[in-house]
């Protein structure tokens, strides 16, 4: 039978499957067509996320049904060089003593009107 898989970009993929096929098999077919690894795929049908070990028949997926493909978001650790860059970007600032505006490291006067473009600046305190 034929089913459709719709991605978040609006692209529709057509797959040839059997009702006895597992969700794992469907994800493998999507990988063959689109190159998306199965561990990054989440399939949704009738508002439910489909579990890998179950079959299409378990979810009452019939011919010409449409599944929705969502990519799994993975959290993780930031690379050390990017961490240093982010820390440098966020900590190398000057602070206005009157209005507490964050300014670039070589600032001489504040850019805000509310403090009268004060020249009373201090370096931002470093995080321990």
Swiss-Prot record:
Gene Ontology biological process terms from the UniProt entry: protein ubiquitination; translation
Cross-link (Glycyl lysine isopeptide (Gly-Lys) (interchain with K-? in acceptor proteins)): 76
Keyword check for Disulfide bond: no
CDD domains listed in its UniProt record: Ubl_ubiquitin
A UniProt-annotated Pfam family: Ribosomal_L40e
GO (cellular component) term, any one: ribonucleoprotein complex
SUPFAM superfamilies per record: Ubiquitin-like (SSF54236), Zn-binding ribosomal proteins (SSF57829)
GO molecular function: mRNA binding; structural constituent of ribosome
The entry's keywords: Cytoplasm, Isopeptide bond, Nucleus, Ribonucleoprotein, Ribosomal protein
Ubiquitin-like domain span: 1-76
Gene3D superfamilies membership: 4.10.1060.50, Phosphatidylinositol 3-kinase Catalytic Subunit, Chain A, domain 1
Similarity field: In the N-terminal section; belongs to the ubiquitin family. In the C-terminal section; belongs to the eukaryotic ribosomal protein eL40 family.
Additional information: Ubiquitin is encoded by 16 different genes. Ubiquitin is generally synthesized as a polyubiquitin precursor with tandem head to tail repeats. Often, there are one to three additional amino acids after the last repeat, removed in the mature protein. Alternatively, ubiquitin extension protein is synthesized as a single copy of ubiquitin fused to a ribosomal protein (either eL40 or eS31) or to a ubiquitin-related protein (either RUB1 or RUB2). Following translation, extension protein is cleaved from ubiquitin.
Entry protein name: Ubiquitin-ribosomal protein eL40y fusion protein
